[in-house]
A protein has these predicted regions:
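Positively charged, amphipathic and often flexible ligand-engagement surfaces
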Residues: 1-181
Length: 181
């Protein structure tokens, strides 16, 4: 279903009902997260499934993130398009009056993404090098830190340099460790 939805292929009647149940189940989980005061992180997947996940995450953020970020979406910054997507969802939130929750990660499907792109004769959606991925990741951090009134950051990284970058920025800007975003 996610592949079909992401490709813009219309659902058949039974698929539409099944998709509706998927959305309902996710919404129930998010409502419970809001009720008990916890965050809900939506994971990222392969690029050909991600448009459907982005659509779901955005609609849930619009619904549940009116006052504070509860719903977070995951951006795999090894993808060439994710920094632009981050800026686009920020604009949507600014215009729509909701908060954005972002979990930044570098990415997990490099070989799979590159192989699929090669087999289909498409350009790879993945940055050409680790250095470019790191640059994209750090640019994402910089963007979010400059927009903390609207965007909340969750870093999913083992990279010490990236974590220290945020800690140093917080220290320099006197942002308390318990800052809500």
């Amino acid at each position: 279903l996610f592949k079909k939805k992401s490709a813009g292929i219309p659902f058949k009647t039974l698929e539409l009902e099944e998709w509706s149940r998927v959305i309902t189940r996710i919404d129930i989980c998010c409502a419970e997260a809001e009720k008990i005061g916890i965050k809900m992180l939506i994971d990222a997947e392969e690029s050909w499934l991600q448009p459907a996940i982005d659509e779901i995450a955005e609609s849930l953020m619009e619904k549940y993130n009116q006052k504070e970020p509860i719903i977070y979406t995951t951006l795999q910054m090894y993808r060439k398009d994710r920094l632009l997507y981050l800026k686009a969802i920020y604009e949507k939130a600014t215009n729509g009056g909701f908060k954005v929750g972002i979990k930044l990660v570098r990415g997990a499907y490099i070989e799979k993404e590159n192989l699929r792109a090669y087999r289909l004769g498409n350009p790879s959606p993945i940055c050409d090098s680790k250095k470019l991925t790191d640059k994209n990741f750090n640019n994402g951090i910089d963007f979010i830190l400059s927009k903390l009134e609207t965007v909340s950051l969750f870093i999913g990284s083992h990279n010490e340099e990236s974590v220290l970058k945020v800690i140093n920025w917080m220290t320099l800007n006197k942002v308390p460790k318990d800052h809500p975003y």
